[in-house]
A protein has these predicted regions:
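Conserved alpha-helical scaffold flanking the Walker A/P-loop in AAA+ ATPase domains
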Residues: 96-99, 147-169, 185-193, 218
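Walker A/P-loop nucleotide-binding motif
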Residues: 100-122
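N-terminal pre-Walker A segment at the start of P-loop NTPase domains
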Residues: 73-101
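Short glycine-rich substrate-engagement loop in P-loop NTPases that contacts/grips substrate
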Residues: 84-89, 111, 126-165, 178-181
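Loop/turn-to-beta-strand initiation segments
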Residues: 134-135, 165-168, 197-203
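Interdomain "pre-motor" coupling segment immediately N-terminal to P-loop NTPase/helicase cores
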Residues: 20-64
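Conserved catalytic network of the ASCE P-loop NTPase/AAA+ motor domain
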Residues: 100-102, 129-131, 161-164, 192-197, ...
Length: 247
């Protein structure tokens, strides 16, 4: 693959308000990173061929059945609740700049209470990556912990390789129960590998600032250095959308 000029995760951006056409009633003080234009000498970004967006590929993404129709189009069609408009605005800007985000390994840390659409929007981003012809994989922390403990060494190695090398990895529901010995070491190694190789990660968590007290500082530094932090506030929306798939 031809060489791709990359941009720094933290050094080469400024923040300023950006208004996205078609999104209304968004606070004007919302800010997001605006990245310098990367110099690309090929038609690929991290191995993603941008001319392959129309291809229909059957890939194993790990997306739970409950979320399998959570494309961005479907999410917008059913309506964005008022309490979610601010984080949705930031996420829509991330999607608008998706090739750049993947190019520099920029991810998202989605924080907030249960039922506030964190997982739904993470899956919507995954579908956008797949639409570019890229690879994406979803795994909940509960399933990851279970897999690390229960599968054979060969199966575990295969899973770890997949988690390391997909273009976008979604780690869902990072919580208190995973700050334990061997699992914590595995998670830290995974985060370190993807940080060093500029691979994007989206993490959802119900933890707020408590996360800083639960995970080793080195790992948290890497998450924050390569992620935009997006806070979701408000009551659970699951009852409101009970006729739809779960938030």
């Amino acid at each position: 693959m031809d060489q791709i000029g990359r941009i720094s995760n933290q050094e080469n951006y400024n923040t300023k308000p950006v208004i996205s056409e078609g999104i209304k009633d968004v606070p004007l003080d919302v800010t997001i990173p605006i990245y310098e234009e990367p110099y690309i000498v090929s038609n690929e970004v991290n191995g993603i061929n941008l001319n392959r967006s129309s291809e229909k590929k059957k890939v194993k993404t790990g997306i739970p059945k409950r979320y399998q129709d959570m494309t961005l189009q479907n999410v917008v069609k059913r309506g964005i609740p008022d309490q979610t408009k601010s984080p949705f605005y930031v996420i829509s800007q991330y999607i608008d700049n998706l090739p750049k985000m993947l190019n520099c390994g920029q991810g998202l840390l989605l924080r907030g209470d249960v039922g506030t659409m964190k997982t739904t929007l993470a899956v919507a981003i995954m579908y956008e990556v797949l639409g570019l012809g890229g690879t994406a994989y979803f795994i909940s922390m509960a399933n990851l912990m279970d897999s690390l403990y229960s599968v054979s060494q060969e199966e575990r190695q295969s899973l770890e390789n997949k988690l390391k090398n997909v273009d976008l990895l979604v780690l869902d529901d990072l919580g208190l129960e995973y700050d334990k010995g061997w699992v914590s070491v595995k998670i830290r190694a995974l985060i370190n590998y993807r940080f060093d190789n500029q691979k994007s990660v989206i993490i959802t968590t119900n933890l707020g600032s408590d996360i800083k007290n639960l995970y080793l500082k080195g790992m948290l530094d890497r998450i924050e250095a390569s992620s935009m932090i997006v806070d979701f506030r408000g009551d659970s929306l699951r009852e409101r959308f009970r006729s739809f798939d779960s938030m």
